């Protein structure tokens, strides 16, 4: 009898342990797959692609790669002597047409005062037409001078905002063309996180919800707020034919992979460039309030740690 009871007890304990293990694994799976979190998140920032508005030789580079610069600080300079000469030439043209316009104005005024009693109407009209032509040439010369002045000012390339110079690829003596990107500027205090959430987890993601960000390789947890959720993503299976009609790919996979939707998260505290733009992180959306770690069960703490390993 005792042997039977002992065997029954062992069987019951085994069944209970199996059931508990199954429940734990099931809860872990649900928590892992349905809670709003992702390992596919990246730090991002506002980046300004700096390109000159004039072409010429680079005569001076005032910064080095990865340097923190202030708004208005000179980054590099382009061939100022050439543009200075162009401005002087334009100023000389303006001075010439100003004198010429004054002469033609006096001549036209004299002929208009004398009238048709002293000369023909054709001569009077000709003087007025010459004056108008010279005035137009003067206006054109003034516009050319203003453009030359603007070009001279733009030979000095300045930082449009506070930030870090990155990917600097200009050197003294190189020729740079107008519009070609010379350097990228990562704006200071503009860092945020883009979390690519699976569509199955968007139910728990709303603007204003709190989020935890753990940079890859770090135990530090940053706090943030969901700023916005992307309004749409590209549909790779839909295209257009030459008449504009929609063409849908007929392939339907047995296992459908969830689309990933970008979620923008605003950081509570800017971290400067400790985690550069493009580096990865794990993001957990905790809901309307921050997670109270002191009330987390051992299971939840383990689940949070397991997220770091995928």
Swiss-Prot record:
GO terms assigned for molecular function: transmembrane transporter activity
Keywords: Cell inner membrane, Cell membrane, Membrane, Transmembrane, Transmembrane helix, Transport
Membrane topology: Single-pass membrane protein
Disulfide bonds: none
Subcellular location: Cell inner membrane
Signal peptide as annotated in the record: none
Keyword presence, Cell wall biogenesis/degradation: no
NCBIfam families named among the record's database cross-references: PRK10559.1, RND_mfp
Stored HAMAP family: AaeA
Function per UniProt: Forms an efflux pump with AaeB.
Protein name: p-hydroxybenzoic acid efflux pump subunit AaeA
Gene designation per UniProt: aaeA
